């Protein structure tokens, strides 16, 4: 879309993405973050052509937000249906983060980027 008609983004004042990392190890190789690793050419196009500022929420940020087993239990107590849903969709990630990173919990990657887009006050950063 950016290559075909960048004017589509003229009504947007910021673009938020979850991808990459700054001073952190990768999640699909020792150095690569999965989204950028899958399609580095697309990532380059976004950074080269995006006509508005990009808010990049990388692994170095998302690794600070962990859904712990105790927090998941609390969510299930407060809202059983929502808790069961969250448990179902995060099971893989709980297992992955324990096996590969020895993190007890589920690192919240994409939802943090969405939350930061909806409420920019929850994230801070620097311009590069």
Where are these regions (language model features)?
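N-terminal acidic, glycine/proline-rich low-complexity segments
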Residues: 1-128
